[in-house]
Amino acid sequence: MEVHNVELQISAVRPDQYPEQGYPEIALVGRSNVGKSSLTNTLINRKSYARTSSQPGKTQTLNFYRVEDQLFFVDVPGYGYAKVSQKEREKWGKMIEKYITSRKELKGVISLVDARHEPTDDDITMYQYLRYYDIPVLVVATKSDKIARGKWNQHESKIKKALDFDGSSAFQMFSAQTKMGKEEVWKWIEDRMGE
């Protein structure tokens, strides 16, 4: 998709704040600092449109980015950040659960994991949760440029094994630095938009 127009339409905490256009929505989930903002910026050809942060746990709302008046990217609060209080985490958890389980415009979820490491317990829980609700998932392994190309298959296998990867899900190695995987991620998104 050629992207020229992107706008942060709303940062929502409740369903009554969600956009009403009815465009397809693709949510981005992952632990804090896994690279959600970098993926978003790469997909929309911007250097720093989605706020990248060296402070994990920064995103505390569902941020709806309107792309070309055709779809929304929904940046979901990062999970697994220790300095956020238990009460805050529970509040986010309920907000995310409500969105994922009841939003009819949600066409798929991009679940980000760090390609360099095995998925965390939170990554595994999120993936299994999405599969339980039968939501189409693309697992994107970020920071792939930090791994020697000859070891990609080994890392992919470890990630899939840890997640108990389901054949109905998709998987993509990705690098915001080199843009590797960008076209494949867009293809998956466009396929979901048609559903």
Swiss-Prot record:
One of its GO terms (biological process) is division septum assembly. Keywords: Cell cycle, Cell division, GTP-binding, Magnesium, Metal-binding, Nucleotide-binding, Septation. This is Probable GTP-binding protein EngB. Its cofactor is Mg(2+). It comes from the Bacteria. SUPFAM superfamilies: P-loop containing nucleoside triphosphate hydrolases. GO terms for cellular component: cytosol. Necessary for normal cell division and for the maintenance of normal septation. Pfam families: MMR_HSR1. GO terms for molecular function: GTP binding; metal ion binding. Coiled coil: none annotated. Mg(2+) binds at residues 37, 59. The gene is engB.
